Amino acid sequence: GGGNIGFNLAKNLENTIDDVRIKIIEKDKDRAELIANELNNTIVINGNGLDEDILEEANLPEVETVIALTNDDEDNLMSSVMVEKFSQNKRTMALINKPNYSLLQSSLKIDDLIDPRMDTVSTILKHVHKGTIETAYTILNGEYEVIEADIIETSEPINKDLKNAN
């Protein structure tokens, strides 16, 4: 999808990775034209990502990773399932807003589910825990935080067992 998330991801990839080849499938014709004019190295296809002809036009066998980023969870899940059906061994990622859909991930053979709420929480945690925090994640619907941090020599946990490090 060529919504805000898809557009910004494509723009970011264009700006950070040399020779990246990106294709966006966007249903809305006006939006497809708008983002096609804004992106330099991205092919924008106007159509429905659930349409087999559109997937053929996107040349799915040559694609390495498919990221479904529409505003519709069901479309994102179905797109990922169709990609697996037509072009096995591709990495699939789907944006979901309904946490219960994460239960379908393995049965639908989707590699990664993107939950914007959890990603937002992780981003906020990184800023709250400034300094040596490398990554921060929430798990089990936000019940726990997993934080990867660099420990400096003056830190309290140095040379202590993890269970005694507070």
Task: Give the label of every model feature segment.
Residues G1-N166:
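Cytosolic regulatory regions of ion transport systems
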